[in-house]
Amino acid sequence: MITPWKKISSKPVGDFRIFKLRSDLCINPRTGKEHDFYVLDSVNWVNVIALTPNQQLVMVQQFRHGSGTVELEIPGGMMDPHETDPVATAVRELREETGYEGEQARLLGKIHSNPAILSNTTFTVLIENCRLQHAVEFDSGEDLNTLLVPVADIPQLVADEKIGHSLVVVALSYFDLWQRGIKKV
């Protein structure tokens, strides 16, 4: 059985606007040896499965600086530091990024974003009966294109690697499990 490692100390290394870097000195319970681990502390994130009455998903295209590619994704973003409700954040992000609003917003699932190096959680929120209601409200660092994609096309887009953002693929997996009645919400 795996035992959690004992943390001896933790010290901040840097503060970089969207995340903080810290160094944790821990003891390996198996060997007793000390090791430094670097952890990125970030606010939690939300991904939005926005389903229209016509069985389409509201999706966005945007340039991603890490990969240097334009990605096909679902709407989402970072929870503001004062926000505690991922469902409310998802409703806000959907409206700001796409102008869409819907009904029956609810949590579909949550995952550790990357437990090897990140301390945060990514929440997937389902919003049904989404319709275009408002103009978009991009912040100065956003440039997105909104499009509607038939739900039936999603598996092939993932298989063809047209949807390649790992957290989006996980969110779409939650959606698939919900559609098949395996994931209850």
Regions found by a protein language model. Give the residues of each.
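Extreme N-terminal tail/first-helix region
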Residues: 1-15
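Conserved Nudix-box catalytic region and its N-terminal flanking loop in Nudix hydrolases
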Residues: 2, 37, 47-92, 138-140
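Nudix hydrolase/Nudix homology domain
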Residues: 2-5, 33, 70, 116-118, ...
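Acidic, metal-coordinating catalytic segment for phosphate/diphosphate chemistry
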Residues: 11-47, 53
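Short, solvent-exposed loop/turn elements at beta->coil junctions and helix N-caps
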Residues: 11-12, 109-114
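Short, well-ordered beta-strand micro-motif
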Residues: 23-25, 50, 126-128, 148-150, ...
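Active-site-adjacent beta-strand/loop module that shapes the phosphate/pyrophosphate-binding cleft
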Residues: 25-30, 114-133
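A short coil-to-beta-strand element that immediately follows conserved catalytic motifs
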Residues: 101-108
